[in-house]
Amino acid sequence: MPKAKTHSGASKRFRRTGTGKIVRQKANRRHLLEHKPTKRTRRLDGRTTVSAADNSRINKLLNG
């Protein structure tokens, strides 16, 4: 049986930390920012961890 491949789209969107958590970028901060409040764009800045409900699914995509 051939080796399972890592999902290339998931590998671009998710990163694993040293402790094993999976982090992602927040959505809604790519374009059309001029009508979004500055408070909202600041809140959407940075990374956040993946929710526990999605953790196992993303693990399968990343591990192949």
From Swiss-Prot:
Q: Give the Pfam families listed for this entry.
A: Ribosomal_L35p
Q: Where is the composition biased (Polar residues)?
A: 48-58
Q: Which InterPro entries match?
A: Ribosomal_bL35 (IPR001706), Ribosomal_bL35-like (IPR021137), Ribosomal_bL35_CS (IPR018265), Ribosomal_bL35_sf (IPR037229)
Tell me the GO molecular function terms.
structural constituent of ribosome
**What start-end ranges are recorded for coiled-coil regions in this protein?**
none
Q: Which GO terms describe its cellular component?
A: cytosolic large ribosomal subunit
Bias kind Basic residues: ranges? 1-42
Segments carrying the region annotation (Disordered) are 1-64
Q: What family does the Swiss-Prot or TrEMBL record give for this protein? A: Belongs to the bacterial ribosomal protein bL35 family.
Quote the HAMAP family the UniProt record gives: Ribosomal_bL35
According to UniProt, the name of this protein is Large ribosomal subunit protein bL35
Traced from the root, the source organism's taxonomic lineage reads: Bacteria, Bacillati, Actinomycetota, Actinomycetes, Mycobacteriales
The primary gene name is: rpmI
